[in-house]
């Protein structure tokens, strides 16, 4: 494969991981990074793989879905995990890094690899066929390239995350929540409903108004689409605005009383098996501690809520992956282009790196004339792939970015003792499925990354 050059656009976690995996497999790579010619407002370091927000790659415990993803990436020779392990700082069971040393380590690995050529310039056009390219430009993709991508994908490009919190099903108090679709439509159990009387509703609105908000970054303009306003912004427009908006009770009478509550919080099934539920319309800029406090204290039925994901809104460029991408992460309308990282709708540093690894393996399969072999669905990598293809979500799901969570995994079979038992079963099954997948694909399975010299 050495005479074939693949272009990778973007030097973040997804792009550097994709470039590394391709180069280690013998493919010549041109890695295009716009720094220092142009910087997004979020970037300050000179090197590749800059961690913009947190320095944490989250839990390293495999009983956590992201920790299991760490383990799988290490087994596949991940550049990002290798450099993170070398530059880690004490953080309990989390994998946190010295972000400057981490960026330097990734940059050194790639600049030191004979198969990688790094070009510092901004691209305003997508590479033409037939040469293959991986687009990994991240959540702050430059405007010109974003416009070309929107044209290529038929306009299916989103510019803001509208992420609502997700609650574990087992932590919802079913003595308070009731199953009902508005006006009785659907199967009847598509939604759970949390009823609020007038006093409860007013107390909740007041808590929203007083709650601590995340300060907008300088590169995030505080302007919102009317279709995805933060709940606290709606609350600022008037006391009853939410009760006439996402919390409207019309058609949601409580079957136990036969009466319509003053307001209703709807929870929508997040996965096919109903293990996680999305708080409908609850995109928010409340800080994560405030979300936990306010939603548990003021929403009936969520006093003991376990949050699988917390809400947020921020600038993000991502495609509607299940409709735009083929299973091998290539663009359906332009098969020579592969997407990787947050632009596909994965959320998080580690998930971005994992997506870069999957895209690289897909490119290798394409170059070898093989059909793409996706990771086994019960692995953490496979769960992310299920998210990207839509297999992890019910029909009609409104595609939004997601971290890797156990709710994306296929359901377990048999009985398992409590939450810990279910997590252990997920991990055991994932490990069993990953090993034969690696063994069956030696041309695309790479050796572990060498230590930095």
Swiss-Prot record:
Q: Name one GO molecular function term.
A: tRNA (uracil(54)-C5)-methyltransferase activity, 5,10-methylenetetrahydrofolate-dependent
Identify the coding gene. Answer: trmFO
Q: What is the disulfide pattern of this chain?
A: none
Which EC number(s) are documented for this chain? 2.1.1.74
Specify the superkingdom.
Bacteria
Q: Which Gene3D superfamilies has this protein been placed in?
A: FAD/NAD(P)-binding domain
Alphabetized, the UniProt keywords read: Cytoplasm, FAD, Flavoprotein, Methyltransferase, NAD, NADP, Transferase, tRNA processing
Name assigned to this protein: Methylenetetrahydrofolate--tRNA-(uracil-5-)-methyltransferase TrmFO
Q: Which GO terms describe its cellular component?
A: cytosol
InterPro entries (UniProt xref):
FAD/NAD-bd_sf, MnmG-rel, MnmG_N, TrmFO
Q: What is the role of this chain?
A: Catalyzes the folate-dependent formation of 5-methyl-uridine at position 54 (M-5-U54) in all tRNAs.
The enzyme's first-digit EC class, named in words, is transferase
């Amino acid at each position: 494969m050495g005479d074939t050059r693949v272009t990778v656009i973007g030097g973040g976690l997804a792009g550097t991981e994709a470039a590394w995996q391709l180069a280690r497999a013998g493919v010549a790579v041109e890695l295009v990074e716009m720094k220092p010619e142009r910087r997004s407002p979020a970037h300050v370091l000179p090197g590749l793989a800059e961690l913009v927000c947190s320095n944490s790659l989250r839990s390293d415990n495999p009983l956590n879905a992201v920790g299991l993803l760490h383990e799988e990436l290490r087994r596949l020779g991940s550049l990002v995990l290798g450099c993170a392990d070398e530059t880690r700082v004490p953080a309990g069971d989390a994998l946190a890094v010295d972000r400057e040393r981490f960026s330097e380590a990734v940059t050194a690995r790639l600049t030191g690899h004979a198969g990688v050529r790094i070009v510092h310039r901004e691209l305003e056009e997508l590479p033409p066929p037939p040469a293959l390219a991986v687009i990994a430009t991240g959540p702050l993709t430059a405007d010109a390239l974003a416009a070309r991508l929107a044209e290529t994908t038929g306009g299916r490009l989103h510019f803001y995350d509208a992420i609502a919190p997700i609650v574990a099903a087992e932590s919802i108090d079913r003595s308070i929540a009731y199953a009902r679709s508005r006006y009785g439509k659907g199967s009847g159990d598509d939604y759970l409903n949390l009823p609020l009387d007038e006093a409860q509703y007013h107390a909740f609105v007041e808590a929203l108004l007083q709650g601590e908000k995340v300060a907008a970054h300088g590169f995030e303009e505080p302007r919102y689409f009317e279709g995805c306003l933060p709940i606290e912004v709606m609350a600022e427009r008037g006391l009853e605005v939410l009760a006439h908006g996402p919390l409207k009770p019309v058609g949601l009478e409580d079957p136990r009383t036969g009466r319509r509550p003053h307001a209703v919080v709807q929870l929508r099934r997040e996965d096919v098996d109903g293990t996680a539920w999305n708080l409908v319309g609850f995109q928010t800029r409340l800080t994560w501690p405030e979300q936990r406090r306010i939603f548990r204290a003021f929403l009936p039925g969520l006093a003991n809520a376990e949050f699988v994901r917390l809400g947020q809104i921020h600038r993000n460029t991502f495609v509607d992956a299940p409709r735009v991408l083929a299973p091998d992460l290539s663009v359906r309308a332009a098969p020579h282009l592969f997407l990787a990282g947050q632009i596909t709708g994965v959320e998080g540093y580690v998930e971005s790196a994992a997506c870069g690894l999957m895209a690289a393996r897909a490119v290798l399969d394409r170059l070898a004339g093989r059909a793409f072999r996706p990771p086994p669905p019960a692995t953490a990598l496979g769960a992310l792939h299920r998210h990207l293809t839509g297999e992890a979500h019910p029909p009609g799901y409104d595609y939004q970015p997601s971290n890797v969570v156990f709710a994306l995994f296929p359901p377990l079979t048999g009985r398992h003792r409590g939450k810990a038992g279910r997590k252990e079963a997920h991990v055991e099954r994932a490990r069993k499925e990953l090993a034969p997948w690696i063994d069956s694909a030696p041309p695309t399975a790479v050796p572990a990354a060498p230590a930095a010299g």
